[in-house]
Amino acid sequence: MPRKRSRFELSIHSLLLSVAVLSGAAYASGYYPPSQQVPIIPPQVPLKGAEATPDIHEFSLRHIFHRGTYEQPDFHARLDVKPDTRLRTVSEDGHEEEYIASESSLLASSSPLTIQRLADRRLPVIQGHLAAARSSGFAAALSPQEWALDTLPGPNITDKPTVLTFAQMTANDYIEEPGTGQWHTINGKFNYSGSFGWQKDGLRGHIYSDKTNGTVVISLKGTSPALFDGAGTTTNDKVNDNLYFSCCCGQGGSYLWRQSCDCQSATFTANLTCIIESMTDEDRYYRAAIDLYSNVTEIYPDANIWMTGHSLGGAMTSLVGLTFGLPVVTFEAVPEALPAARLGLPSPPGYDPRFPQSRQYTGAYHFGHTADPVFMGTCNGINSICTWGGYAMESVCHTGQVCTYDTVADKGWRVGLGTHKIENVISDVLMTYDSVPSCVAEEECFDCELWKFFRSNGSEITTTTTTTTTTTSPTRTSTCKTPGWWGCLDESTTATTTTTTTTTSTATTTTCMTPGWFGCNDPTTTTATPAPTVTTTLPTVTSTTTSCHDPGWFGCRDETSTVATTTANPASPTSTACHSPGIFWGCWDEPTSTTAVTSLPAFTSAPISTTCHSPGIFWGCWDEPTSTTAVTSLPAITSTPISTTCHIPGIFWGCWDEPTNTPAVTSAPTPTS
């Protein structure tokens, strides 16, 4: 048997509850400026004697509210529509159309609707929950006693005429003919002008009421982006849309997206605290929608409030409906589960506030069709019109129930932004189908699955790393016009230098009698008979020209001509011809060495040419080349070449037999410097 509570326990419980409510209100007053405060509105409860059977309501336009955002963030005005107020309808492309009569009525039926919502929905209490969520980064954790499961009259979404009536409310966009109405300033200065500047900035609400003022419908209409209605747009439209419906304020995607915050820290990584702070600024649509709703409840404190909207206005009405527990009917609304989770809206026990799409009994119904990329959450590809317009519409999940017309399968429509307009939806979808579709929840839907989000308190440290790289590149003294696999195949030129040389005609020859694996084990030095020492200071010019006409894989396979001209007394060069090259390297036949003839000034040398008819597979020459020794003309100088013959070449390199050396005999007259 449950234990009864004593009076003392009840008194303590009442005292703690009062302190909690006052603390939330104090927190809200400290965060929100005094200009935004309105009188405390009692919680909305079902009307007494609400009938269980559907009831017909006859609605008519009573007020037009306007809440400024960017250009006039403090502006809030109300126009009371009277019988003598003349209104004009404004089409979605911004052009004024025909006059309408303010007494025109719209019919809709109601049916019982169950909503799980907060028991205390007064504005200061709600603002306290939102402020606490913004401060801590998490939705307020509330006890089950703070929630109620209420059954109240709501729109009959199974009735086609009722759905059409709500769609017509969202399509009606009225302006007042100058001089026929009186705008009441709720907050801020209203600078009246015939051009109605408020059309271009802020959130506009059309207020419909039935004849008893027992049921009121708020139809929110945001500033329509030019991407949707063809009119001129502003940067503020993209900023607001990308802030609410993008994973990170238009960052991390296409370069065409308009960035509305700077919260991305790395690729697919963002600071969630930074995003939430940007979303809850006073000049954002969500704050404007709450202010507009609070003023309506001030006029109709005892009425049941229903909400409706199209596109961006539909998303804002859904967020307000989740906040205050109101019936909502939207059309082609932008998926709003992502901003609902980030705003920290309270969730009933048993539901994760990070996934508001999993909640039941929300009272929200979203009508749309499959050919609308905005409603389906697919207007974000690189080729989509949304992207080219600068909009980052990345959210894909709706809260509540989704009622979808499959126009792609039923009518063969292609997905396109032209099907998003509410007038097209009414004439081509809602009126053509015989019945309304069934409504289901999107519980298994997830937003921004590729992203990682972290929370911070604003004290994180950003570290910047600078890397310095030093690159050293070699300097070439020649230009290659025909490069090969492992070298240059075209002609090369060596620069001409002028030096002062001292030449001594002493030749030294070293013969290895016993070669080893890594050198010579028995070196023998033979010194030739020197000629008289000649010391000359002359310019030295060296020029080498190489031409390759038939390059191979690892070398040149055609004739190579070398022209050497030396004007000095250098050491004698040696040329060797190989008839039987080794398998890998070295020479296996008897080489022939020729010593060049040294000359004095007025020396002329003919070019030496070598021709290879059978080049090796990888490198070297396998045939017997033809060598031509230059004939020189010197005054009484005779030079005998030194030849060396190897009979037993080494396995890998070197010569294993005793070579034969012939000393050079030089005869020359006394040179003259």
Curated annotation (Swiss-Prot):
Topological domain spans for side Cytoplasmic: 1-7
Catalytic activity: a triacylglycerol + H2O = a diacylglycerol + a fatty acid + H(+)
Localization (cell): Endosome, Multivesicular body membrane; Prevacuolar compartment membrane
Carbohydrate-modified residues: 156, 191, 213, 271, 295, 457
Family matches, as Gene3D superfamilies: alpha/beta hydrolase
Membrane topology: Single-pass type II membrane protein
GO-annotated cellular components: multivesicular body membrane; vacuolar lumen
Keyword Transmembrane in record: yes
Enzyme class: hydrolase
Keyword Mitochondrion recorded: no
Transmembrane segments: 8-28
Intervals, Lumenal compartment: 29-673
EC number: 3.1.1.3
Pfam entry (one): Lipase_3
Domain of life of the native organism: Eukaryota
Main location: membrane
One GO molecular-function entry: phospholipase activity
Residues annotated as the enzyme's active site: 311
Gene Ontology biological-process annotations: antibiotic biosynthetic process; monocarboxylic acid biosynthetic process; multivesicular body membrane disassembly; neutral lipid catabolic process; phosphatidylserine catabolic process; piecemeal microautophagy of the nucleus
Keywords of the record: Autophagy, Endosome, Glycoprotein, Hydrolase, Lipid degradation, Lipid metabolism, Membrane, Signal-anchor, Transmembrane, Transmembrane helix
Subunit (UniProt): Binds to both phosphatidylinositol (PI) and phosphatidylinositol 3,5-bisphosphate (PIP2).
Family the entry assigns: Belongs to the AB hydrolase superfamily. Lipase family.
Function: Lipase which is essential for lysis of subvacuolar cytoplasm to vacuole targeted bodies and intravacuolar autophagic bodies. Involved in the lysis of intravacuolar multivesicular body (MVB) vesicles. The intravacuolar membrane disintegration by atg15 is critical to life span extension.
Protein name as it appears in the record: Putative lipase atg15
Organism the protein comes from: Penicillium rubens (strain ATCC 28089 / DSM 1075 / NRRL 1951 / Wisconsin 54-1255) (Penicillium chrysogenum)
Gene name for this UniProt entry: atg15
